[in-house]
Amino acid sequence: MSKGTLYIVSAPSGAGKSSLISALLESNPTYAMKVSVSHTTRGMRPGETDGVHYHFIQKEHFEELIQKGEFLEYAEVFGNYYGTSRVWIEETLDKGIDVFLDIDWQGARQIREQMPLAKSVFILPPSNGELERRLNARGQDSDAVIAKRMSEAKSEISHYDEYDYVIINDDFDTAQMDFRSIIRAERLKQDKQTTKYKGMLEALLAD
């Protein structure tokens, strides 16, 4: 059995990366895919569930886990910590399951340094105006927070060229199709197919 592929997915807040990942998993229920549930010190938003959207923990606990080396990557964003469990990622990939990480460019850099075989995808909004409209439509943040997110968006977007793939989320269905195409192409690579069809290939090449 071949190992799963780790996908790093980044985007400015409001570009739709979480929605695209969720839609991908829902539309491919037979595929072995999971989303990594990060740890965070930020407060829980309406509609979120502990252990499903994030593992919500106190700052002191998070810093203890940092000292123990429990995170594959971690970063401080908007005054809150976010981190990814090292053990869970490695065990899940060993089972042949693809894992998706919804993280920012800082975390992506840390992941690539430690796991160079990971594939990375950057989601772009079609315009700054559309990005701001989406942030307002969520109804989750104050005007001040939205202004800060828009200010940070340019910095986040400036790192798009560090990624393997880039998707423009203008039309959601088209963006979702592009995302599925990336996963499909990765699964058709020679090394993956050789492992999956080892017996068939041996039979085809037998004298």
From Swiss-Prot:
E.C. number(s) listed in UniProt: 2.7.4.8
Signal sequence annotation: none
Lineage of producing organism: Bacteria, Pseudomonadati, Pseudomonadota, Gammaproteobacteria, Vibrionales
GO CC, alphabetical: cytosol
SUPFAM superfamilies: P-loop containing nucleoside triphosphate hydrolases
Annotated ATP binding sites: A11, P12, S13, G14, A15, G16, K17, S18
Catalytic reaction annotation: GMP + ATP = GDP + ADP
Cell compartments where the protein resides: Cytoplasm
Keyword Kinase carried by entry: yes
Coiled-coil positions: none
Disulphide bonds in the chain: none
Gene that encodes the chain: gmk
Keyword match ATP-binding: yes
Entry-linked HAMAP family: Guanylate_kinase (MF_00328)
Domain Guanylate kinase-like: start-end pairs: 4-184
GO molecular function, a single term: guanylate kinase activity
Name of the protein in question: Guanylate kinase
Family the UniProt entry places it in: Belongs to the guanylate kinase family.
Keywords on record: ATP-binding, Cytoplasm, Kinase, Nucleotide-binding, Transferase
InterPro entries per UniProt: GK/Ca_channel_bsu, Guanylate_kin-like_dom, Guanylate_kinase, Guanylate_kinase_CS, P-loop_NTPase
Function in brief: Essential for recycling GMP and indirectly, cGMP.
Domain of life (superkingdom): Bacteria
